[in-house]
Amino acid sequence: MNLPKQLFHWFEQRQSKLCHRQLLVITGKKEWTINAAKALSCNQDIQRVLWVGDDLVEYENISIKDYRSKLGQEYDWVVLNCFSGFRANAAVALSGTIKAHGIMVILCPDLFEWPDYADPEQLNRISYGYQHKHVNSFFIQHLISSFSTNSSVAKLSADRFSGKLFFVDDNLDKERYTEQQIAVQSIRKVAQGHKNRPLVLTADRGRGKSSALGIAAAELMQSTVKTICLTAPHIRTVEQVFFHIKRLLPDELQAPIIITFIQ
């Protein structure tokens, strides 16, 4: 499929150095946007792709209403097919599952047509007692305006690509690990200190809370704490916690560990 050369140059530059997470908006006819996203994902070194809104067998996929089942997991790409419906809550929540250097891809109609698009999710936004009728979406208009004014948003259409690069500053990378170390130390201090002194760990989605819990749990299991109770709305939301526990625990300590899921 023919795509603008500037797009491939943009991806090549992104692969050359660690970049911030970015949004790529692909606009046009439904079939073309889907094929463009599939072609791009095949050309990139991507391990995990989550496709939201279509039942595409070659990718891990969910309907947009099931977005909560993926919270706590990590993906290189999250593709949000807005032709199947758009939910702002889902888009914001799933943005937190994107790994460092990753991309969220939004597939949508041409931007001047999108506000008038008959969104399948519109039925879920109608209050009881009101009849459904198609209306122009002011929120989509606001979203499109945000795309235009935010220089970090890359945009692709059938005949044009525009996008800037946002590399991660070396000092910023060091500060990230410093904050994580403080979080891990705080968790250990609470677990090994006086009883009934809780710790509240807050951060935006996708900023490493689960990773910090996993690192702290592995360190605690090598010292005095042998029983840890972890609660979550879904088993998959704590995958990163157990990933870091297994990564950091010595082999001789992993064998006797018993993990029990209680629902």
Where does each model-flagged region fall?
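Inter-Walker segment of RecA-like/P-loop motor cores
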Residues: 54-76, 228-263
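N-terminal accessory nucleic-acid engagement/regulatory domains that precede
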Residues: 69-165
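N-terminal pre-P-loop "Q-motif" helix
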Residues: 2-11, 172-197
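Conserved RecA-like ASCE P-loop NTPase motor core of nucleic-acid helicases/translocases
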Residues: 21-29, 41-54, 200-203, 225-241
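Conserved adenine-nucleotide phosphate-binding loops and their immediately adjacent elements
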Residues: 163-174
